[in-house]
Amino acid sequence: LIVIFPEKYGGTVWRDGAEGKRPETNILKELLPYLEKQYAVTGDRRQRTVMGFSMGAAGSIYWGAKYLDLFSAAVALDAGGGTSFSDPKARNYVPEYGKKTEAIRKSLKLRLVQGALNTRKFRESLNTLKIPYDYVQLPRDISAYPAESSCLNKKDLTKKFLHNPACMTEGKWGEQTWSFIEKGTHRKEKQ
Protein backbone atom coordinates (compact mmCIF):
# COMPACT_ATOMS: atom_id res chain seq x y z
CA LEU A 1 0.00 0.00 0.00
CA ILE A 2 1.33 3.42 -0.99
CA VAL A 3 -0.08 6.72 0.29
CA ILE A 4 1.07 9.85 -1.56
CA PHE A 5 0.55 12.92 0.65
CA PRO A 6 0.85 16.21 -1.30
CA GLU A 7 1.78 18.97 1.13
CA LYS A 8 3.62 22.32 1.13
CA TYR A 9 4.17 23.03 -2.55
CA GLY A 10 3.11 26.65 -2.13
CA GLY A 11 1.18 28.58 -4.72
CA THR A 12 0.72 25.70 -7.14
CA VAL A 13 -2.64 24.16 -6.23
CA TRP A 14 -0.70 21.00 -7.17
CA ARG A 15 -0.56 21.75 -10.89
CA ASP A 16 2.43 22.09 -13.18
CA GLY A 17 3.06 25.62 -14.38
CA ALA A 18 1.87 27.65 -11.41
CA GLU A 19 4.66 30.08 -10.51
CA GLY A 20 7.01 28.06 -12.73
CA LYS A 21 6.80 25.05 -10.39
CA ARG A 22 6.15 21.46 -11.47
CA PRO A 23 4.58 19.42 -8.65
CA GLU A 24 2.87 16.92 -10.96
CA THR A 25 6.08 16.30 -12.88
CA ASN A 26 8.34 16.29 -9.80
CA ILE A 27 6.24 13.93 -7.72
CA LEU A 28 4.19 11.79 -10.10
CA LYS A 29 6.46 11.59 -13.14
CA GLU A 30 9.92 11.72 -11.52
CA LEU A 31 9.82 10.73 -7.84
CA LEU A 32 7.18 8.00 -8.04
CA PRO A 33 8.86 6.13 -10.94
CA TYR A 34 12.20 6.47 -9.12
CA LEU A 35 10.69 4.93 -5.96
CA GLU A 36 9.13 2.14 -8.00
CA LYS A 37 12.51 1.32 -9.52
CA GLN A 38 14.75 1.76 -6.47
CA TYR A 39 12.53 0.26 -3.77
CA ALA A 40 10.22 -2.12 -5.59
CA VAL A 41 7.26 0.13 -4.79
CA THR A 42 4.16 -1.14 -6.54
CA GLY A 43 2.91 0.48 -9.72
CA ASP A 44 -0.55 -1.04 -9.19
CA ARG A 45 -3.10 1.80 -8.83
CA ARG A 46 -5.28 -0.51 -6.74
CA GLN A 47 -2.66 -0.28 -4.01
CA ARG A 48 -2.30 3.50 -4.06
CA THR A 49 -4.07 6.35 -2.30
CA VAL A 50 -3.53 10.09 -2.56
CA MET A 51 -4.29 11.95 0.68
CA GLY A 52 -3.65 15.56 1.63
CA PHE A 53 -4.41 18.24 4.20
CA SER A 54 -5.73 21.75 3.45
CA MET A 55 -4.19 22.80 0.11
CA GLY A 56 -2.77 19.27 -0.08
CA ALA A 57 -6.38 18.06 0.24
CA ALA A 58 -7.20 20.16 -2.81
CA GLY A 59 -4.26 18.41 -4.47
CA SER A 60 -5.59 14.99 -3.54
CA ILE A 61 -9.03 15.88 -4.95
CA TYR A 62 -7.35 17.03 -8.17
CA TRP A 63 -4.78 14.23 -8.56
CA GLY A 64 -7.26 11.52 -7.61
CA ALA A 65 -9.55 12.48 -10.50
CA LYS A 66 -6.88 13.45 -13.04
CA TYR A 67 -4.69 10.40 -12.47
CA LEU A 68 -7.16 7.53 -12.25
CA ASP A 69 -4.41 5.34 -13.69
CA LEU A 70 -2.28 6.01 -10.57
CA PHE A 71 -4.76 6.03 -7.65
CA SER A 72 -7.76 4.02 -6.49
CA ALA A 73 -8.61 6.26 -3.52
CA ALA A 74 -8.36 9.95 -2.63
CA VAL A 75 -8.69 11.39 0.88
CA ALA A 76 -9.10 15.13 1.48
CA LEU A 77 -8.44 16.28 5.05
CA ASP A 78 -10.06 19.68 5.62
CA ALA A 79 -10.00 20.88 2.03
CA GLY A 80 -10.89 24.52 1.73
CA GLY A 81 -13.63 26.01 -0.36
CA GLY A 82 -13.15 26.98 -3.96
CA THR A 83 -13.18 23.47 -5.44
CA SER A 84 -15.28 23.39 -8.61
CA PHE A 85 -15.54 21.20 -11.68
CA SER A 86 -17.47 23.81 -13.66
CA ASP A 87 -15.86 27.20 -12.87
CA PRO A 88 -12.43 27.69 -14.53
CA LYS A 89 -11.86 30.73 -12.29
CA ALA A 90 -12.25 28.67 -9.10
CA ARG A 91 -9.18 28.47 -6.89
CA ASN A 92 -9.17 24.67 -7.21
CA TYR A 93 -10.64 23.99 -10.65
CA VAL A 94 -11.02 20.24 -11.22
CA PRO A 95 -12.76 19.78 -14.59
CA GLU A 96 -11.99 16.05 -14.50
CA TYR A 97 -15.02 15.46 -12.27
CA GLY A 98 -17.30 16.78 -15.02
CA LYS A 99 -15.34 15.20 -17.89
CA LYS A 100 -14.61 11.76 -16.42
CA THR A 101 -17.70 11.35 -14.24
CA GLU A 102 -18.43 7.72 -15.11
CA ALA A 103 -14.80 6.63 -14.77
CA ILE A 104 -14.54 8.38 -11.40
CA ARG A 105 -17.76 6.75 -10.19
CA LYS A 106 -16.40 3.33 -11.10
CA SER A 107 -12.79 3.56 -10.03
CA LEU A 108 -12.09 6.26 -7.42
CA LYS A 109 -13.03 5.97 -3.76
CA LEU A 110 -13.30 9.48 -2.31
CA ARG A 111 -13.31 10.53 1.36
CA LEU A 112 -13.73 14.07 2.69
CA VAL A 113 -12.89 14.71 6.36
CA GLN A 114 -14.03 18.16 7.37
CA GLY A 115 -12.79 20.19 10.32
CA ALA A 116 -12.82 23.98 10.24
CA LEU A 117 -13.13 24.56 6.50
CA ASN A 118 -16.08 24.01 4.17
CA THR A 119 -16.59 21.76 1.14
CA ARG A 120 -20.37 22.13 0.98
CA LYS A 121 -20.42 23.37 -2.64
CA PHE A 122 -18.02 20.66 -3.79
CA ARG A 123 -20.15 18.02 -2.06
CA GLU A 124 -23.24 19.46 -3.78
CA SER A 125 -21.41 19.09 -7.11
CA LEU A 126 -20.49 15.49 -6.32
CA ASN A 127 -24.13 14.81 -5.43
CA THR A 128 -25.31 16.39 -8.70
CA LEU A 129 -22.89 14.17 -10.63
CA LYS A 130 -23.87 11.16 -8.50
CA ILE A 131 -20.24 10.54 -7.61
CA PRO A 132 -20.19 8.58 -4.35
CA TYR A 133 -18.01 9.79 -1.50
CA ASP A 134 -17.50 9.20 2.18
CA TYR A 135 -17.95 12.31 4.34
CA VAL A 136 -17.06 12.98 7.97
CA GLN A 137 -17.58 16.25 9.80
CA LEU A 138 -15.47 16.52 12.94
CA PRO A 139 -17.59 17.25 16.02
CA ARG A 140 -18.48 20.87 16.65
CA ASP A 141 -19.00 20.28 20.37
CA ILE A 142 -15.76 20.83 22.26
CA SER A 143 -16.74 18.19 24.84
CA ALA A 144 -16.33 15.55 22.10
CA TYR A 145 -12.54 15.86 22.41
CA PRO A 146 -10.41 14.44 25.23
CA ALA A 147 -8.03 16.87 26.99
CA GLU A 148 -4.98 15.49 25.14
CA SER A 149 -6.62 15.83 21.71
CA SER A 150 -4.73 17.57 18.92
CA CYS A 151 -8.08 19.11 18.03
CA LEU A 152 -7.92 21.46 21.02
CA ASN A 153 -6.07 24.75 21.14
CA LYS A 154 -3.25 24.07 23.62
CA LYS A 155 -3.16 27.74 24.69
CA ASP A 156 -6.89 27.82 25.40
CA LEU A 157 -8.53 24.42 25.92
CA THR A 158 -11.97 26.01 25.60
CA LYS A 159 -11.27 26.49 21.88
CA LYS A 160 -10.94 24.00 19.06
CA PHE A 161 -8.12 23.80 16.56
CA LEU A 162 -9.74 21.65 13.89
CA HIS A 163 -7.65 22.79 10.92
CA ASN A 164 -4.56 20.72 11.65
CA PRO A 165 -3.47 17.34 10.27
CA ALA A 166 -2.96 15.73 13.69
CA CYS A 167 -6.59 16.44 14.52
CA MET A 168 -7.74 15.01 11.18
CA THR A 169 -6.02 11.66 11.76
CA GLU A 170 -6.66 10.97 15.43
CA GLY A 171 -9.56 9.33 17.22
CA LYS A 172 -12.30 7.33 15.58
CA TRP A 173 -12.35 9.52 12.43
CA GLY A 174 -8.64 8.83 11.96
CA GLU A 175 -9.23 5.10 12.40
CA GLN A 176 -12.12 5.33 9.94
CA THR A 177 -9.88 7.08 7.41
CA TRP A 178 -7.25 4.32 7.57
CA SER A 179 -10.01 1.73 7.29
CA PHE A 180 -11.39 3.61 4.27
CA ILE A 181 -7.93 3.58 2.65
CA GLU A 182 -7.56 -0.12 3.28
CA LYS A 183 -10.97 -0.83 1.74
CA GLY A 184 -10.27 1.55 -1.17
CA THR A 185 -7.09 -0.28 -2.05
CA HIS A 186 -6.67 -3.93 -2.82
CA ARG A 187 -3.69 -5.51 -1.19
CA LYS A 188 -2.20 -8.58 -2.73
CA GLU A 189 -2.54 -11.69 -0.63
CA LYS A 190 0.69 -12.82 1.00
CA GLN A 191 1.96 -16.10 -0.35
Predicted regions and their residues:
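Non-catalytic cap/lid and distal C-terminal segments of serine-dependent acyl enzymes
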Residues: 1-191
